Amino acid sequence: MLEGKRSYQRGQETLVPSNNASPIPESQVIPKAQEKPWYIQHFIKLLIGFGLGGGAVAILLPWMLWMLCDISSGSSDQLRLHLLYITGGIIAVLTLLQTNWKNQGDRLKIDADIKKNEQDAEKNERDHIRQVHAERRSRYTKAVEQLADEKAAVRLGGIYTLVGLVDEWLADGTLIPEERQKEGQVIVNNLCSYIRSPFPLALKAEVLESDIEPTDYEGTFSKDQAAFREEQDVRRTIFVEMSKRSSDVIWDDDKLIEIIPGTWSDFDVDFSRAPIFYPLSNLTIEKGNFSSAKFYSAANFFSSVFNSDADFREATFTSNVFFNEVIFFSATSFVEANFARTADFIATSFTDNTNFSGATFSSRVNLSEAEFTQSTPIFAMSISNIGVWRARFSAQADPKDYMFENSLKHTLEIRCGTAELLNRTFILPLGTVLYDPDSWDERQKEYTRLSEPAQ
């Protein structure tokens, strides 16, 4: 296994999504026993009683009245008939009451069955959700383990799995938005942790990017070169997948119309202190926190877009830097950044504040075609109790390599002055200084020969 993978395995964040699918108490459907009314409890007795009693009254009462009161035979028959009608009506009412009570019981039973079926369906749904979430967490754990595998294909598979899991959490309609974001953020943190993990072969980036093996190379050049290129692809894939899910920029005739947030736009990302040894060109970078990052070989951001703040504070660029045709939509900071070689900002667009205070430039700087639409870039900044933080430019460079005069019509001008050191005169941004690279003091960790500020 590559040492870089071991470093990631030791240093990765032990982040496991929390289990949100907590058991929900399930109420049992126990229909309340339907209490029988008195006429139902004694229905048979009442039916027989009214039948026999009504029949007896219908026979005896007319006969007694005929005998005692001497009513006519026709009246007696009419009375008997009415008594039978009344008896039949009472029996019919009892029957209707009994039928109604039975129907009510059937309805209650049906309602209870429906409610039980609904609760069973809800329980099955909860069980399914718990199963889905558990399966996701199992895939998450396996994918994190894959990131430490010595085979690049396995690591790449782990990255695609983690990216897919983030999308699944975000699309999970069973969770509230805050929980979806929380679950996705855990996985994004792991992807960022992988980007920040050490990779020892990055120290040999310039050598391994060459097709010619040095005669004094320590190790197996072909093996190291293959591992280096594989890891370049693996780590760049993370940025590519994030870029696909970042904000979309709508243009009309080179005019910004709208920025449409992407599905991952609200996630926090952290690439600080990361070793970067692969190109980051043609990407949309939502939140570019590269503070204290170290860029090995050429730092290539050609045609990339930064939608939010771009933070390169204290970043170290060990080789050439290309921010050509890059668009910065928000504040950009290169405070105390160290540019060891060429720094090109050709056709770069800065639409918000840009700060180069305290930055160190060792070779060519080209800002001649950069566009500043919000404010002029800051190269010297006064800080209370500290003094003035000034950008520094090497006095051993060719004065013609520092290009700040801009011919673009729609840009704010970089105000420049002159500074002298080592009997050489340079045109630099106001307030900045020249330094002698040979004057480095290891004890003070500082250059001791500086020019007066450009004015």
Tell me the role of every PLM-derived stretch.
Residues 34, 59-62, 81, 97, ...:
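Acidic, low-complexity intrinsically disordered regions
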Residues 11-14, 30, 121, 398, ...:
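Compositionally biased, intrinsically disordered low-complexity segments enriched
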Residues 14, 30-36, 75, 96:
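Single-register position within the heptad repeat of long, parallel alpha-helical coiled-coil rods
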Residues 25-55:
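Juxtamembrane interface helix immediately N-terminal to a transmembrane segment
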Residues 129, 138-145, 150-163, 168-205, ...:
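N-terminal leader/targeting and pre-domain segments
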Residues 44-134, 138:
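Membrane-embedded hydrophobic alpha-helical segments
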Residues 37-38, 109, 186:
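Coil-to-alpha-helix initiation sites in intrinsically disordered, low-complexity, charged segments
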Residues 2-29:
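Short, charged cytosolic
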